[in-house]
């Protein structure tokens, strides 16, 4: 799917070291980028890369300076170029507080995707490489790394303007450098964490278990319901969609004359109507898994108390019928010892 680029610009942050002090200086463009096929292709790649990264949700704090200027932009009180220049200086001031600060290219882009307006902000690194020119000579070149970036945020402008109480209009990349982002990029935005997808997924799993318990389902019936929930969530995940609570409820059996969505509301699980799915958490609906002290185990939940027995008194698992490939490895190891 394509995106429609409305406005975009690049500015640079340059690191200057003077003794023990670090200062980030901003090099600002004085005009927006022309929307050429190359610019559109670059933004499409950035959009696709961002879509595939692990993200957390955020909201603006009440006194966010960035949010105040963003609001002025949306109210058409200032132009996009002026907004981008001010934002770059704001980021330079924040980034200069940290020893790990490095030079980079800041991109700000306002674009539309699937009838939704977004503001994308990312700090991109430059990479060095070699190219062969028309004379077959080798030359050094520098390029923007638009696939491997980890300092970025995106604001859903449509959601921000339509739903003031939303807790998911801002997303940012989380991961190995999550601390960096929380330390300076979120401070630059004047934002704090909003919706927590991990907590929402865990609450959903607990709600499903409790729903089966209050419905007095036996083990097989409970496993069937959990598998049904997992298949729905897996489908949503594969299609890049959220878990829609009412849609999920409609697919489940009504227990004790109470649909699943009504049960969750009455029990105050605090579930959102739309929940971003997390694959690793949802797997526990149908599997038991764990690792530690050199052992990693994972098996289907339906095998417990059939092929797999757990004795809590001795803290042991007994497995009847090992996987053929594991059995083969064990037999080879036994022969080599003898």
From Swiss-Prot:
* Source organism phylogeny: Bacteria, Pseudomonadati, Pseudomonadota, Gammaproteobacteria, Pasteurellales
Membrane-crossing residues?
Answer: none
| UniProt keyword Nuclease, yes or no | no
Gene Ontology cellular-component annotations:
bacterial nucleoid; cytoplasm
Q: What is this protein called?
A: Nucleoid-associated protein HI_0839
Q: Which UniProt keywords apply?
A: Cytoplasm
Main subcellular localization, coarse class? cytoplasm
Write down the NCBIfam families for this protein, in alphabetical order. PRK00378.1
Q: What's this protein's family per the entry?
A: Belongs to the YejK family.
Task: Identify the InterPro entries for this entry.
Answer: Nucleoid_associated_NdpA
UniProt-annotated location(s): Cytoplasm, Nucleoid
Task: Decide whether keyword Cytoplasm is in the record.
Answer: yes
One family from Pfam that matches here is NA37
- Molecular function per GO: double-stranded DNA binding; single-stranded RNA binding
